[in-house]
Amino acid sequence: MEKITDKVFGGERPLFEIHNVELDHVRITFGESGIKECSNIVCRNCYFEGKYPLWHVKGSDIRNCYFAPGSRSAIWYSDDMHMEDCVINGPKFFREMKNLSLKNVTINDADETFWGIDGLKLENVVLHEGTYPFMHCRNIKVDGLQSDAKYVFQYSRDIEIRNAKIDTKDSFWEVDNVTVYDSELNGEFLGWHSRGLRLVNCHISGEQPLCYAKDLVIENCTFDPECDRAFEYSTLQADIRGHIKSIKNPTSGRIVADSIGEVIIDENIKQPADCQILTR
């Protein structure tokens, strides 16, 4: 493998069509498409500040690198990538990719990041700011995620999440086949219009959670006092630990809690209107 060390590249496409190359302490300055149409690329201790630095790259390993705010839309259409111990300050990262893994990565502008990814693995990843991360993704595994970005995991499917802390409203909308373990989910309107959403050993806060959900499963979860009007028009099986403030018009299934503040069943309930609501 060829090695390029302590070099600076700028302008347009300075490293176009390179293959089997390691870049060490390389700086990609202002310009566009620094590393494009490449394969088998290793980046160590590199600094990226130009736009679109890694497009159409097949097979890459990126470690201890920094992506400046100017490196927007940095990594699109690049498959089989591993990134570790990196900091990202640019928006719109990671689009239309297959087999992407991140470990110990902080993304400080997560705006429109992770769109259209098939095969995503995250370990100890932090997301800040921005809107709609993880849009239209599939086959995701997460162990360790902290996120205050808005509207995460919408229109995505086949997801397993462990040890996450997610702070936003409107998370997990229109998802399909998602299981979340041992996590804290904070924000109103959680999981609306979801299909096959399963929450295990989670703590949930925010108003009107888990409405319009189909085949919702809740196992050994707790709810903050602010969680009112839960489960409206949802079909579900729920095992709730502790108290839940209020439940409104669930469509079908079974809900068990230690205590329930209020059950609202009115003329607007949808059929079959046969949900069992029980206290221990």
Predicted segments, located by residue:
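Long, distal/terminal scaffolding or interaction modules
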Residues: 1-280
